[in-house]
Regions:
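Terminal targeting segments of Actinobacterial cell-envelope proteins
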Residues: 1-51
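Solvent-exposed, non-transmembrane regions of membrane-associated and secreted proteins
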Residues: 46, 52-53, 58-313
Length: 313
């Protein structure tokens, strides 16, 4: 008979203790986004890998830049001097045969062909370049180029030249070292032309670079009233500097009375942000002695040799 009590032998076993809570779905406990502690060794490896990759990238970029500089300064110079030698030899052969390369002879000057020789005593006896006709990239890779449409050596107006300052032969590398009164000599088949860099206190007929007070910052008074400086820095788009009267568009070539020489190059070195312009005026003309059959004596006259001894370095 039951009295509502439970016998000891019939008591149910005690329940098992509850299990500890497991990790949330998708990962374990602890810190981190997914409940894991980050492995410090793996993080360090990633940082080292990034730094190593960045270093290799910078080294590669530096090598590329160095190779580019070597190419621009040395390799292009080698190619330019090779082309310059070829152009010079061709011009000398034409002259020796009595063939004139300038339009004044009735022949058209062709782009890329030599038309005259350029000497600047300030830069030493080794400085000698054959001027080519034209100023496009291919022309200027051979040497200083004569701007199409500007006057020829010795003519009234502006005989204007362009040349590279760094690389590709760099004929105008030291254009900034010219002084007021310095001579710039242009040789054609028939004539030597001695231009004088403009400057105050300078006898332009004598080209005296030692004149006291001579300065490129001063100007030459053109009869038109225009003041032409010995040197100026302009923007690349300023084409007025090679007009018949530099920087004076009001004077046409037919009315020009002064014989100018203008040389243009990039400024400052290693950039093309600006253009350096040097202006000179014709001081002396020395005709060559005719030898017959269209040929002329190519002996350097004493007056030209004297310019190298007179220049004050």
């Amino acid at each position: 008979m039951s009295d509502g009590t439970v016998a000891v032998g019939d008591a149910p076993p005690p329940a098992d203790p509850p299990e500890p809570p497991g990790p949330p779905p998708g990962g374990g406990g602890g810190g981190g986004r997914h409940g894991r502690e980050p492995d410090p060794h793996r993080v360090g490896d990633l940082v080292r890998m990034f730094v190593r990759g960045l270093g290799q990238l910078l080294v590669t970029a530096g090598v590329i830049v160095l190779l580019f500089v070597v190419y621009e300064v040395y390799v292009t110079n080698w190619f330019a001097h090779r082309e310059q030698h070829r152009v010079h030899q061709a011009l000398e052969q034409e002259w020796s045969k009595g063939e004139l390369a300038l339009p004044e002879s009735g022949l058209a000057a062709l782009d890329g062909h030599g038309i005259a020789n350029l000497y600047i005593p300030r830069f030493g006896e080794d400085y000698a370049w054959t001027i080519v006709q034209g100023t496009n990239d291919a022309d200027l890779e051979k040497g200083p180029g004569h701007y199409d449409g500007t006057q020829l050596p010795g003519q009234k107006g502006d005989f204007a030249l362009a040349g590279h300052r760094v690389g590709k032969g760099e004929p105008f590398l030291n254009l900034d070292k010219l002084r007021a009164g310095d001579s710039v000599v242009v040789e054609t088949q028939t004539t030597w032309y001695v231009y004088c860099v403009i400057g105050a206190g300078t006898d332009h007929a004598a080209c005296d670079p030692s004149a006291p007070g001579a300065s490129l910052s001063n100007t030459y008074a053109d009869p038109s009233g225009t003041k032409v400086p010995g040197r100026e820095i302009v923007s690349p788009s300023d084409g007025n500097v090679i007009l018949p009267v530099p920087s004076d568009p009001a004077v046409p070539a037919q009315q020009a009375t002064v014989r100018y020489l203008t040389m243009t190059t990039c400024h400052p070195k290693f950039t093309a942000a600006k253009r350096m312009i040097v202006h000179a005026v014709l001081g002396r003309t020395i005709p060559k002695q005719a030898k017959g059959n269209g040929r002329y004596d190519d002996t350097i006259p004493a007056q030209i040799k004297a310019l190298y001894t007179e220049v004050g370095n």
